[in-house]
Amino acid sequence: MVKKNKIIVTGGAGFVGTNLIKLFLKKTKLKIISIDNYSSGKKSNHIKNNRVKYIKGKTVNINKLIKNPKDIKSVFHFGEFARIFQSFSKMNECIDSNSVGSNAVFNFCLKNKIKLIYSATSASLGNNGNDKNLSPYAFSKSKNLELLENLKKWFHFKYEVIYFYNVYGPHQICKGPMSTVIGIFEDHYKRGKPLPVVKPGTQSRRFTHINDTVNICYYAWKKNLCRHYSIANKKSYSVIEVAKLFNSKIKFLPKRLGERYASALINKNLSNKMYKYFGEINLKDYINNFIFKNN
């Protein structure tokens, strides 16, 4: 019997993928394969370890990129297009990644009997589920959840789903169109520039540290219970509140397409109970520590 001693992390050179790989190197003896197209991932995120292999490629080509799928224990599919506002101007790229690419990953796992761990988004949950229609990004992600639900019914496909909430922390993107809110604020603070806040500024988010996020990813993988998890923070901040924590000047930007007023925290999605977990790392403490280090 072939020993399954490897996991795949799509988006392994990106923000979440890099932190997940670090955690798995620490907690397991598994070998790790990263698949990343480097649209937002960086070679500077590569971890020098003989247990990690980095492959440049698109998820749609996963069957060609992975020569021996019998070795693969699990796939963490985190390599999707992951920005709401940018999905309007880059809709083809969003659909290519989130629909076509993800379908290839799902089929790869199904065909080879590999467990999938999939990153979902809180952006599609609010307003009684209607927020899924706010942007191409939210729509594509919600359709993937519907597909997974049907794959479970049709083929008994096994997977875990983890809902992310405005993740921040080490390796986050700070510059360019794929930047995170906290990353943008940190970058502008370092450069002495006013922090950009999209109007009205009162839109609230449950900012969740990357360590809390990947710990739940690992927990879900380890427990192997085929559940839907959410990892958020108990405290919700408005964007303007967060900007003010930096004690810096603020400039307002025009309202944007697809903007949600609040992060949704629900008990159920589709037919699945949501197992809710809350992060331990406090955003205010994190920002205070950042300011201390940069003064």
Model-derived regions: residue spans:
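The catalytic Tyr-centered alpha-helix of NAD(P)H-dependent dehydrogenases
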Residues: 132-140, 164, 174, 178-182, ...
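Conserved C-terminal active-site "lid" loop/helix of NAD(P)H-dependent oxidoreductases
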Residues: 210, 238-241, 256-293
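Hydrophobic alpha-helix immediately C-terminal to the catalytic Tyr-X-X-X-Lys motif of short-chain
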Residues: 143-151, 181, 185, 242, ...
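Short beta-loop-alpha junction of Rossmann-like oxidoreductase domains
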Residues: 128, 170-173, 240
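Glycine-rich Rossmann NAD(P)(H)-binding loop
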Residues: 10, 167-171, 197-207, 229-237, ...
